Amino acid sequence: MKAKHFLLASALLLWTGVLEAQTYQVPVSEKNEKMQEGEFEPTWESLQNYKVPEWFRNAKFGIWAHWGPQCVEGSGDWMARSLYLEGSREYKHHVEHYGHPSEVGFKDILPLFKAEKWDPDKLVSFYKKIGAQYFFALGNHHDNYDLWDSQYQEWNSVNIGPKKDILAGWAEAAKKNGLPFGISFHADHAWSWYEPAQRYDRHGEKAGVPYDGCLTKEDGKGKWWEGYDPQKLYAQNHPLSAGSWADGMIHRQWAWGNGVCIPTQEYVTNFYDRTVDAINRYNPDLIYFDVTGVPFYPISDAGLKIAAHFYNHNMVVRKGDFSAVMFGKILTDEQRKALVWDVERGSPNSIYEEPWQTCSCLGGWHYDTRLAENGWYKSASDVVKLLVDVVSK
């Protein structure tokens, strides 16, 4: 049975032709977290043995709680980057309500993320009641803040902000309500995404004063974040990528080319460790990455090892009753045999043979008061029309 899928996010969701013996510019280290051995190996050739589980072929509708500290200011998606873009709407809002980014950066927003009214069981049971057949939670976004009790990222929701393991709450609620559970990971791009935090104002009374993106652990003495290293969050102890001051350049460098500053092995391995840690703790049925192919491909084998680990781990935990679904965006035909294709805010223009997914949101990917105040969030009829289009293909 063919199945097309629609994942709705609430703001409250190179192929080289060389399959073996490929040398990677930034090979991942397995010093901390070992890849689960099993049927799948970290090569495209091996991963193409993947078969989409029947449960996902039959599912049609999922809901994604794309929710984290970037919702605090109500400025919409990518606000943790945009607050460092001088003159932007997000910058102006941040300066007016919180302070100048040389003094108050995104790190200082994290304690304001309280989640004091969060009731995961109530929400997930509601999602199931309205038809959700699987549920996704945000594990981390490009802001590099982990929403669980992360042993490899000190900037996490247990240490700073809610003082709660958000993923654990979502996972328990999904299990209680009998919904397959998914986690999305986006922090691999924090390396280049946060580069504007290295900037400074070019105009006005703060001209030339550096933003907080280059602060170190030593700078925190006597401050609320004493003992924490801002570089563990911002990851900006590296040169800027080519054209970094051009705000849109990051989109051309998303696949780790076009002059992007190549991340270090330490950075790549940290993302690998965090992702494997979350997989091992919460045993998700689905994982999603906001990437071209898999994380850090083609400069690193980290993403391929994550994929192999996820599939093999799922086989062990499920005792052979395989349930794993891993999504990738902008995939070659061969890569689509190894992963499930995800199309962000769109759909193919014709029927596609294999299962695929559209991910979309009611408004912005993070809460945006402007959209709410102007009535620009999707209506129920908008969602139904999109769902019909997706499922029909």
Predicted regions and their residues:
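Mature catalytic domains of secreted/periplasmic carbohydrate-active enzymes
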Residues: 22-393
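Bacterial Sec-dependent N-terminal signal peptides
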Residues: 1-23
